[in-house]
Amino acid sequence: MVRMEDIISLAKRKGFVFQSSEVYGGLSGAWDYGPLGVELKKNIKKEWWKSMVYLHENIVGLDSAIFMRPEIWRASGHVDGFSDSMVDCKDCKSRFRADFIDLSKNCPNCKVGNNFTSPRSFNLMFKTHIGVVEDSSSEVYLRPETAQGIFVNFRNVLDSSRLKIPFGIAQVGKAFRNEIVTKNFIFRTCEFEQMEMQFFVHPKQIDEWFCYWQQNRMNFFIETLKISPDRLRFKAHDSTQLAHYAKAAFDIEYEFPFGFQEVEGIHNRGNYDLTQHAKFSNKPKVFEYHDLLTKEKYVPYVIETSAGLTRSVLMTLCDAYSEEELSDGDKRIVLRLHPKLAPYKIAIFPLVKKVELTEIARRIYMELCDDFHIFYDDSGTIGKRYRRQDEIGTPYCVTIDYNTIEDETVTVRERNNMTQKRIFINDLYSYIKTEILNYKEDFNK
């Protein structure tokens, strides 16, 4: 099992994730995504969007505002019910979520005893003000989830897109929660990104679609992101674990170095949200669906799929990371990312920094850069250049050598097994396209 310290070291060293405000000592639970991190996030987001919107004719996208009317959060139950139970250790002053520790045992931090304060409720929403006057009339919240922006746009999307039940609305965006404890690198933070889809169905079809989306989402992690199946599992919520809006819920959990934790939730939200907004807005017809064929009118039920984009980044790094002992006794660090997710698809290396080789290398770069994100490197030994690309997950390295001048062929070196092939320059584009399309992961890595 990979160690968390190895992932954190790689992430900072190679430019995936940096500590936010590091030059000023850092800000706990806040992280910046570097050149490779933004590419990995973008690629995961792209695959999610494709799987949700492009591969389903009845799902469309939305990008709702972070700031919304505070009445929305009162209607949704977040103002009154979106809270965690918090305790403090009276000896060391450490703060914990009450459901994360055993209050009958010693403090996890100081180990002195179980001298905790009584559990008290802590609302997770960030409150701020819009306008020049800071009073109750200008209060707004940073959204704690993207879902409510979808629900209040139910009628807008339904009418403008001419959709019929069942249909879905997908959204990727930032959410904010004033977590009692931020921990495990980018896993639990106050600012994060969600990939959510709300699927509206007839109440009688809720169970059928709930089962469909459970399997669909698990397949996404295994078949699209190529996450190891033996590190994924479903976990059902019992009645004591359900959120205030949910009738049923399943989590997809991944086995991180710190244990199995949620990466996506699939929830049967019933008609809770639409009914609440109909009530609080006093516009019930806006949230009602009229089936023109059957003449039936009803408030749709909702199935939610809610994945953490930032958690998916961490999961992908953990699952792809490997260390290999080579025959010469050296150690090779490899990120076995699916080529679709890799920040760079190709690295181009002139064997030596000679003009006759660099000119060809630059020409190949320009021919391919419209379709592939490419890293160009002409410094250092070829072995060290290979190792640098292995460590950031680049699947294919193309080397231009003196034979290239003679026969217009290059060496293509594959990341996972380090095999090399001579490929004609004119065939390079189609060769790499085919390799990416036919890529198969070895889950026994």
Curated annotation (Swiss-Prot):
- The record lists ATP as bound by 177-179, 187-192, 262-263, 308-311
The family note in this entry says: Belongs to the class-II aminoacyl-tRNA synthetase family.
Q: How does it assemble?
A: Homodimer.
Keyword set, alphabetical order = Aminoacyl-tRNA synthetase, ATP-binding, Cytoplasm, Ligase, Nucleotide-binding, Protein biosynthesis
Q: What is this protein called?
A: Glycine--tRNA ligase
This chain is encoded by the gene named glyQS
Please name the HAMAP family in this protein's record.
Gly_tRNA_synth_B
Query: Where substrate is bound, by residue?
Result: R97, E145, F192, E193, Q194, M195, E196, E304, T305, S306, A307, G308
**One Pfam family from the record:** HGTP_anticodon
- Would the keyword Zinc turn up in this protein's UniProt record? no
What is the source species?
Borreliella burgdorferi (strain ZS7)
